[in-house]
Amino acid sequence: MTITPQHLIALLPLLIVGLTVVVVMLSIAWRRNHFLNATLSVIGLNAALVSLWFVGQAGAMDVTPLMRVDGFAMLYTGLVLLASLATCTFAYPWLEGYNDNQEEFYLLVLIASLGGILLANANHLAALFLGIELISLPLFGLIGYAFRQKRSLEASIKYTILSAAASSFLLFGMALVYAQSGNLSFEALGKSLGDGMLHEPLLLAGFGLMIVGLGFKLSLVPFHLWTPDVYQGAPAPVSTFLATASKIAIFGVVMRLFLYAPVGDSEAVRVVLGIIAFASIIFGNLMALSQTNIKRLLGYSSISHLGYLLVALIVLQSGEMSMEAVGVYLAGYLFSSLGAFGVVSLMSSPFRGPDADSLYSYRGLFWHRPVLAAVMTVMMLSLAGIPMTLGFIGKFYVLAVGVQASLWWLVAAVVVGSAIGLYYYLRVAVSLYLHAPQQPGRDAPTNWQYSAGGIVVLISALLVLVLGVWPQPLISLVQLAMPLM
């Protein structure tokens, strides 16, 4: 296949981030300068975001059999780039107090972003696997970046071993799918399944193994055991990336796979996914109830949020509303998580050992950092799905598609899970307004709102509130991505 200038335009975000990786690598070799390398990384990610406009002008097209660039890919590429940009922004003040190598952090985030963009554009199981590995391998280093702390190193080892096992399941599943269908392309798989091959035992076994591998990456029950330990052990900016960019990119490619290859048409697959969704919603929320560590709480919370999204994925073939639901929910989850983890990052910066992730550290925050406490409150309310926030719009969409498909047991799980979640999210919010302890612990800088990280947190809070009241711009953007598929 000949690569034309149109193809190069379509690949601009991938090429720009790839070029930024090379530039930052050479910059580190030439001169170790934290500010310079952080600036180069942020410029590269911003340039990749701007390039999406030119990609949109080029229109939808296949770039090699591995990738398809369309509205769907642009939407998820944009979300991954926003999450990566926020991660770099939160990392800069955190790394200012870090005495070991600082610059490699940005290099690893850029490489992981490259994997996320590849996943957003993937149209082939080979591209899916390459993207997942490209996003996972840098995370091994990022999670253990504060390697002098036992908890960070332990989290990195856990994630590395379990991620390798999950990748093995995923690869073996792909091998079985290829053995039965003779194809790895999403579209070709769709044709094979349409020819009545969906109920072949070998194919179902292959998809079953793939669900195990992808379930681990998405922290779905029962493949979730790594999540709270890794969220707690990883540095706060890394937890931000794990909770947002990594999950969004992988869920995006799973959604495309289900669109082209209607795996959900199999009753067996639908039942298995339904049970996983139900268990993730209930277990994630129940386990979060007793947590006193905010990062662990958000880790268990992410399990339940992916369970909610799985409800929309199960009914993906039934109409466009489920695609819309996933897009809106992921955008709400992105901004809410960026705000919540952003506050934790600001409270933990500069690096002084363990992060400020204990609930006790936030007790009485309102009385000396009122705006920061207000931001954290908005994020907790959005994650809980309270009306007038973007989180409510996403949860309402999920309930609507569940009702439309008559999945009453999953609708009940969403309602019960949301009620349970309300308790622990409000527990965090209420602690912000209690009397401050006699011996205050960690605190955010006095001028936090003027820092780049503070601006990102404030913008996230503003978007959560504005789009919660007036969601039409976001809904229109998500709808715009759908016809180009």
From Swiss-Prot:
Its EC number is 7.1.1.-. The keyword Cell division does not apply. It comes from the Bacteria. It catalyses: a quinone + NADH + 5 H(+)(in) = a quinol + NAD(+) + 4 H(+)(out). It is an enzyme of class 7 (translocase). Keywords: Cell inner membrane, Cell membrane, Membrane, NAD, Quinone, Translocase, Transmembrane, Transmembrane helix, Transport, Ubiquinone. It is found in: Cell inner membrane. One of its GO terms (biological process) is ATP synthesis coupled electron transport. One of its GO terms (cellular component) is plasma membrane. The chain crosses the membrane at residues 8-28, 35-55, 71-91, 105-125, 127-147, 159-179, 203-223, 235-255, 271-291, 297-317, 326-346, 373-393, 408-430, 455-475. The keyword Kinase does not apply. It is a multi-pass membrane protein. One of its GO terms (molecular function) is NADH dehydrogenase (ubiquinone) activity. Disulfide bonds: none annotated. Belongs to the complex I subunit 2 family. HAMAP family: NDH1_NuoN_1. NDH-1 shuttles electrons from NADH, via FMN and iron-sulfur (Fe-S) centers, to quinones in the respiratory chain. The immediate electron acceptor for the enzyme in this species is believed to be ubiquinone. Couples the redox reaction to proton translocation (for every two electrons transferred, four hydrogen ions are translocated across the cytoplasmic membrane), and thus conserves the redox energy in a proton gradient. This is NADH-quinone oxidoreductase subunit N. It comes from Salmonella choleraesuis (strain SC-B67).
